[in-house]
Amino acid sequence: YLGEKLAEQKADVRVLVNNAGCGTTGNIGFGATSADVMRVVDLNVRALTMVTQTVIPFMTRGAKIINVSSIAAFCPTPRMTVYSASKAYVSAFTGGIADELRPKGISVTAVCPGPMKTEFFDAAGDHDLFGNIPWCDPVKVVAGTIRAAKKGRTFYTPTVFNKFYRFVAKILPMKWMIKATRV
């Protein structure tokens, strides 16, 4: 349907922001329901992929795609396993299509914020899980993401804490990171 509408209008999409997402807390197999798990995969992975694939043919040089990922992409997060896996997909997908679209002059940026006070957390529940992690200011995240996209950066991680987390996740054994991120 989206592709048909874009074709009808002879659209020239300048910016695509894949911001829809959801998460759930709870252990997979018990705690998180199958419906919750599939909702996360369907929205965070399948919908993002299909919307992107549908819109790309309607983009020209100078267009930008912004995908909302998360610091959860850097390391598996117990009790948010499916969410962190879905965001790892978003980051990997972004890196891959950024390279594929670069010759066409289309830039792709993944923003990887930490927790933010948005409607996302009302739906995900378990707000206390993130009590010790510095929260991101949504307005600052958006401003930084726009700057990063304009510069053609493939990844943008706001705040010093989140940048440090990304760095540590790259150098420490995954087993240690999983233990540290157990929420």
Question: Could you say what each language-model-derived stretch is?
Answer:
Residues V13-V17:
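Conserved hydrophobic beta-strands of the Rossmann-like cofactor-binding core
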Residues G23-M38, R79:
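Conserved mid-core segment of classical short-chain dehydrogenase/reductases
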Residues S70:
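Residue(s) in the substrate-gating loop at a strand-loop-helix junction
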Residues P76-S84, G96:
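Active-site loop-to-helix junction immediately N-terminal to the catalytic Tyr of the SDR YXXXK motif
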Residues T52, S86:
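Active-site helix of classical SDR
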Residues A98-N162:
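SDR active-site lid
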Residues Y1-D12:
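Conserved amphipathic alpha-helix within the SDR
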